[in-house]
Swiss-Prot record:
It comes from Homo sapiens. Signal peptide: none annotated. The modification N6-acetyllysine is found at K310. Hydroproxyproline dehydrogenase activity is inhibited by THFA,(1R,3R)3-OH-cyclopentane-COOH and 5-OH-1H-pyrazole-3-COOH. Keywords: Acetylation, FAD, Flavoprotein, Oxidoreductase, Proline metabolism. SUPFAM superfamilies: FAD-linked oxidoreductase (SSF51730). Its EC number is 1.5.5.3, 1.5.5.2. This is Hydroxyproline dehydrogenase. Dehydrogenase that converts trans-4-L-hydroxyproline to delta-1-pyrroline-3-hydroxy-5-carboxylate (Hyp) using ubiquinone-10 as the terminal electron acceptor. Can also use proline as a substrate but with a very much lower efficiency. Does not react with other diastereomers of Hyp: trans-4-D-hydroxyproline and cis-4-L-hydroxyproline. Ubiquininone analogs such as menadione, duroquinone and ubiquinone-1 react more efficiently than oxygen as the terminal electron acceptor during catalysis. Belongs to the proline oxidase family.
């Protein structure tokens, strides 16, 4: 867990003399202990090694056979688990979050459970009901992390839709909503009404079993959103595979009809938009305008995106157009355009529009802070920033020190639950891990500074 060396005092707002570019040179690393920095450097270097990411699950099984569960588990807890996971128990999570708060960072809890799109469907509803229980407990934990609890500050947590409904159903809905006339049968308003009433919609494209599963899925989503709203916790819905996006967007829109209305006090259900997809800018603009016309609050988590290798492979297999941007630069340009669109929207609509700039890219973060100052957007959380726990701390700490609202995405749970989740995330975010070279350099420089006081390491 984190060990704080100094308590960080953050500013109340942007610089009074004009915008000043933030420095992401690792200067804020003085807030962390030498042991933390050493572990971070070693783990990030390990995770940047492609064979470890590609064969992570196999290597984990091999280490358990060779070392035994006890030694293997101890090694993981001291390395990867300790770097990226808050802990297993509520007390461990609270301890991690308390340390983050001394660094002016806030928690964004994530339940590490999901269903892979190509996996066999789970039998019955029991698996999804179990996940519902985990989500409700996450709501409780998210709310309990505020000390003392305050209605002035809402907690945030991540929500994975395919933990509550099957990917097979999502694929059926995704193919159906693209057809002419489907908008009447599967409108967000009709789904929202079914969530409230519990009625079976009898959607014509689904068989009886699928319709029953849809009914149960809508009920689960409604129960999570209803409980989260009562506990003052905002839900950030995770992005998933492109093949599921139309269904996920439909379900999020249905939740928004109910929970993002003006009387509810801002967006309680947010959607995630991936800049790596070619259609994201147009879809984001369309959704923002639709929410504004309907009088609904609009919450967005903007990410560069994941799943790139699999998205391209699936498109090639089925002879479809690649839905992803052609290269890193195109993705960066897409992110910049989406960021500008949303910041302008926030400036115009104030508390009815919230944005999380979820990026490890220094230039994207600088663009956001500069435009916030130019547009007069206050540092009250309508625009916040997000990075993964255990990564990009040189950016997170600098933002927190400057007074911006910063969240760290925090998975928690047992080794058995979290390690497979982390390996999948690593496989989906190879570019992020391999692109963390600058952070490794900054960590190395800080460690050299501590080990050899007064000496400067000559860069290679």
């Amino acid at each position: 867990m984190l060990r704080t060396c100094y308590v960080l005092c953050s500013q109340a707002g942007p610089p009074s003399r004009g915008w000043q570019s933030l420095s992401f040179d690792g200067g804020a690393f003085h807030l962390k202990g030498t042991g933390e920095l050493t572990r971070a450097l070693l783990v990030l270097r390990l995770c940047a090694w492609p064979p470890l990411v590609t064969h992570g699950l196999l290597l984990q099984a091999w280490s358990r056979r060779l070392l035994g569960s006890r030694l293997s588990g101890a090694f993981l807890r001291a390395s990867v688990y300790g770097q990226f996971v808050a802990g297993e128990t509520a007390e461990e999570v609270k301890g991690c979050v308390q340390q983050l708060r001394t660094l002016s960072l806030r928690p964004l809890l994530a339940v590490p459970t999901e269903e892979e799109p190509d996996s066999a469907a789970k039998s019955g509803e029991a698996w999804y009901e179990g996940n519902l229980g985990a989500m409700l407990r996450c709501v409780d934990l998210s709310r309990g992390l505020l000390e003392p609890p305050s209605l002035a500050e809402a907690s945030l947590m991540q929500l994975k839709v395919t933990a509550l409904t099957s990917t097979r159903l999502c694929k059926e809905l995704a193919s159906w909503v693209r057809r002419p006339g489907a908008s009447l049968e599967l409108s967000p308003e009709r789904l929202a009404e079914a969530m409230d009433s519990g009625q079976n919609l009898q959607v014509s494209c689904l068989n009886a079993e699928q319709n029953q599963h849809l009914r149960a899925s809508l009920s689960r989503l409604h129960r999570v959103a209803q409980y989260a709203r009562a506990q003052h916790v905002r839900l950030l819905v995770d992005a998933e595979y492109t093949s599921l996006n139309p269904a996920l967007s439909l379900l999020v829109a249905a939740l928004a009809v109910r929970w993002n209305s003006p009387g509810e006090g801002g967006p309680w259900v947010w959607n995630t938009y991936q800049a790596c997809l070619k259609d994201t800018f147009e879809r984001l603009g369309r959704d923002a305008e639709a929410a504004h016309r309907a009088g609904l609050a609009f919450g967005v988590k903007l990410v560069r995106g994941a799943y790139l290798d699999k998205e391209r492979a699936v498109a090639q297999l089925h002879g479809m157009e690649d839905p992803t941007q052609p290269d890193y630069e195109a993705t960066s340009q897409s992110y910049s355009r989406c960021l500008e669109l949303m910041l302008t929207h926030v400036a115009r609509h104030g508390p009815m529009c919230h944005l999380m700039v979820a990026s490890h890219n220094e230039e994207s973060v600088r663009q956001a802070t500069k435009r916030m100052w130019e547009l007069g957007i206050p540092l009250d959380g309508t625009v916040c920033f997000g990075q993964l726990l255990g990564m990009c701390d040189h950016v997170s700490l600098a933002l927190g020190q400057a007074g911006y609202v910063v969240y760290k995405s925090i998975p928690y749970g047992s080794l058995e639950e979290v390690i497979p989740y982390l390996i999948r995330r690593a496989q989906e975010n190879r570019s992020v891990l391999q692109g963390a070279r600058r952070e490794q350099e900054l960590l190395s420089q800080e460690l050299w500074r501590r080990l050899l006081p007064g000496c400067r390491r000559i860069p290679h």
